[in-house]
From Swiss-Prot:
A motif (GXWXGXG) lies at residues 20-26. Pfam families: THAP4_heme-bd. It comes from Streptomyces coelicolor (strain ATCC BAA-471 / A3(2) / M145). This is Ferric nitrobindin-like protein. InterPro entries: Calycin, Nb(III)_bact/plant, Nitrobindin, THAP4-like_heme-bd. Belongs to the nitrobindin family.
Amino acid sequence: MIEIPSDLHKDLVPLVFLLGDWAGAGVHDFPGAEKCNFGQEVSFTHDGRDFLEYQSHTWVLDNDGNKVRPLESEHGFWRIDANRKVEVTMTRDDGVIEIWYGELADQKPQIDLVTDAVARTAASQPYTGGKRLYGYVKSDLMWVGEKQTPEVELRPYMSAHLKKVVTPEDVERWAKALPDDMPDDGIAFFK
């Protein structure tokens, strides 16, 4: 269920499908790096201003799905203009700072992004740019990331399937919104 918070900046309504906490798993595979399954937690929040704040933490999973060690972390800010153009500024824990531009698709919750600028610290690994695709499919958030380095052409390196995290506060809020005249069997149909 997608809810539009009353204090959400009006410009962000097209991105409302991103809001909330997400968790799931994916695959990481890039030449010269460890191939692994990973877990991920993502958060998109807002404070009433004209951007979403984004945080992502990933970790390597063992064969039983247990956390082994951190993989990557990102923090950024997402904006959208009246023409559905999306702008993202992002800082990664590996010493890379990126500016991404893209577009929200017409008639579907899908965002295509491509890097416009990349800045790297001396300690970071070689990286020259990337692409990302985010999509909201059947109430889940899915994404795929591509990257390139001076030695490797643009190719997919990470993808994940995330589920919305439901908190006890969400359940309580939804329960309070139920009608008082619920049938005894607990089944109700809403118009």
